[in-house]
């Protein structure tokens, strides 16, 4: 359009020179409007941007023989994702449920510790460390479906999700965002990136970035209130000679008063579950219930480009977190639905530290005239966690009226003390070696292979002063996992691929928090393997793009917790999952775009006995068969864009024998974006427009409800 405007200007200028005297006539040219034609985040799939999660070789999604999805910064903002929990629900086939006790992510038929959640590629081996935080501090979220232990270590048979934090860039950034919404939600966020030294030549140039965010309010359960803050800052230094260094620090703080843990279901709790509408917002936690977390990250990243063919990167990292809990966490209605029985009063502290160093290299070479790229490295980490659990008396139970009640102060509970007493300590030391290669067998046929070997040492020790015989358990694990994938570019617009990958998972969940009994019962990690076939293509004159994959995953020797008592463990011999994932992006017209994804999985136990009963053929609890997402945007004018989205989740089983379930649900969202200028944008969103009552997690006697109708506005100013 700009070239057309210049041509039109030239033609009209020539005409004016021919028809008028230069000394006496001046002609005013018509105004030419130039509109921003950036790709809409809800349109075509962005498959040609390099990612760091599907491979360490810097491949794009289109080049990777695996299912890879990237939710970038622009997409996060366009869809109004306020937290990392919101972002996860945009990934294909992903279902999440988040309370402060645990963040349960389900993908490809597996959940919990079978889904690796890593931060800038760093695996903390602890799912509670993945509490949802505001999305402002993240540049993007990347996901690879299926086994990925060969990239990020033990875990990840179902998927790996990688949160990439904002860091300093080589260009100026100045932005402020203010938000307000229902239930007194408030947000204030700020971002700044500047060169503070040097002339931009790459010799002794230094860039600093700081991003801050503060949120308050927005909670929907009665008497639940809280606030959170995040600060991310980094210094990027170009020191010359191909050497750069980035020093990054991150701080997170959150306090949630009287947090919500769930809602009791109507009794009898058999078959289809339901919740009485009048109990939707009830909060049965203690009057002074609390969740608090303080998290700090420090990373030192040195990159050295030795030549066009060889580069080396070293990352030193430190993580320190403290999480405090004082809550009554479980509730059940009695058989007449006239009182709520409250149990599981827990005072807890998690003191978690991780330190490590990772050095890896990338080499571009040839083998017999064929391009061959290599990535190889060493990762060493030291993971320490001390827990401070104190329970109320074993027989403690409180009964209250479902509608009119006053709950106690937590420290008034029988047997409860007001100090944190260390009870358990976990130490996990890990030394890993990894290697990855991509070789061009022909100009259109590429072979991708990967291998990782780990030397893991786990040490559990009891610190409980009341124990007469101290518990002490040690295990060593030496898993080797890998991937082999083949990608065939059948045309410039389409490719097909096949891959086989393996994984090694902790049998009973997270290595940094597993119970002593589980350590004794499991002398090896569980094994998993996957076969996947897929295709990625552009079509319709590059106005459409799509991906499709089918997979078969099998995992052996699993330990799972009893849904009625998390301290009771059952052993599962084998669990399988077969499924299909698809993504579609369309630019229907210059103003109208659409994007959708769907995940279907048939997950079932193959070998599982509980109390002498075979549960073979049953679906694991809280694993939906189908998850579908849809977004569409329409630009009414260059300044105003409307959008809508919908999410459908099929039934969630609440126990292992599939006798209770929460039914399928669909929620719809709407929003708009208005650009007052290229630097000022007003956005508005309404989630769950119909105010649908739905659950994101099902348990035998209670469910975790999803958010009711929620609306908010944000103003973002760039300067």
Language model segments and positions:
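Acidic, small-polar-rich N-terminal luminal/periplasmic segments of exported/outer-membrane proteins
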Residues: 29-172, 533, 700
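Transmembrane beta-barrel wall of Gram-negative outer-membrane proteins
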Residues: 173-175, 180-260, 290-306, 452
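Repeated loop/turn-to-beta-strand initiation elements of outer-membrane beta-barrel proteins
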Residues: 200-201, 205-208, 242-245, 309-312, ...
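Face-selective signature of the C-terminal outer-membrane beta-barrel domain
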Residues: 296-320, 343-463
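Membrane-embedded beta-barrel scaffold of Gram-negative outer-membrane proteins
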Residues: 301-317, 321-329, 489, 495-497, ...
